[in-house]
């Protein structure tokens, strides 16, 4: 292949104008492609930030680990009456480790009927009906499912919790794919203690 290099170089040198135009055109096309991609990504990031600004998360102050926060669940009604509040989602959080770890498992317990409106998830497998109808059901983020080898229909246990996987979801926010969402009441009763009436946070 290299024996043709001298001929190639001679051809490029003899037709310098055409070579310059070809290289310049390719460079401009690549620049436009990168510029449009950067603008599109910037607009998507801006839209995501604007959406996130519309949410406020409240949990108990002075807690090193948010999962240890305890707030009255009936705050939901009081918060819902505040001007500008469209909806309130009480959330119970359980994590197997509050310290830095490469494999922290985080459960979010939410009212099952509110999950689809509170989060923009797409089910890759399973069904929302299965999740909503069974109290021990959970939907698992794609990242967690990949790390743990979890599939729809299987059971997953960690600590005192055992859930039936009703589905695996994806999200536009990669961080969300590291969580497991279960029923609020299941998580309140699932740690050998009765936490009914209290939640970790309101969103």
What do the PLM-derived regions correspond to, one by one?
Residues 1-32:
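N-terminal Sec/SRP start-transfer signal
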Residues 2, 37, 41, 181:
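Electropositive phosphate-/nucleotide-binding environments in soluble metabolic enzymes
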Residues 11-12, 46, 50, 159:
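Amphipathic alpha-helical segments that mediate coupling or scaffolding at interfaces
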Residues 23, 47, 119, 191:
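Short, flexible helix/strand-to-coil boundary loops that buttress conserved ligand/catalytic motifs
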Residues 27, 31-106, 127-134:
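Hydrophobic, regular-secondary-structure patches
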Residues 91-92, 100-111, 122-197:
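Hydrophobic secondary-structure segments that place a key small or acidic residue at a functional site
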Residues 113-118:
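Short helix-loop capping/hinge motifs at secondary-structure junctions, enriched
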Residues 200-203:
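"Rare, low-scoring activations can occur
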């Amino acid at each position: 292949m290299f024996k043709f290099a001298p001929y190639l170089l001679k051809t490029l040198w003899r037709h310098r104008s055409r070579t310059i135009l070809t290289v310049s055109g390719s460079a401009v096309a690549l620049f436009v492609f990168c510029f449009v991609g950067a603008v599109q990504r910037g607009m998507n990031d801006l839209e995501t930030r604007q959406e996130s600004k519309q949410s406020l998360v409240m949990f108990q102050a002075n807690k090193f680990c948010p999962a240890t926060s305890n707030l009255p669940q009936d705050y939901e009604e009081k918060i819902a009456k505040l001007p500008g509040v469209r909806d309130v989602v009480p959330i119970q959080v359980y994590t197997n480790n509050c310290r830095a770890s490469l494999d922290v498992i985080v459960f979010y317990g939410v009212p099952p009927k509110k999950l689809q409106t509170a989060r923009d998830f797409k089910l890759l497998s399973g069904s929302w009906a299965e999740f909503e109808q069974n109290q021990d059901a959970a939907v698992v983020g794609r990242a967690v499912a990949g790390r743990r080898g979890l599939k729809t229909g299987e059971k997953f246990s960690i600590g005192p919790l055992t859930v039936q996987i009703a589905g695996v979801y994806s999200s536009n926010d990669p961080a969300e794919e590291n969580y497991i969402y279960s029923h609020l009441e299941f998580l309140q009763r699932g740690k050998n203690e009765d936490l009914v009436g209290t939640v970790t946070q309101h969103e």
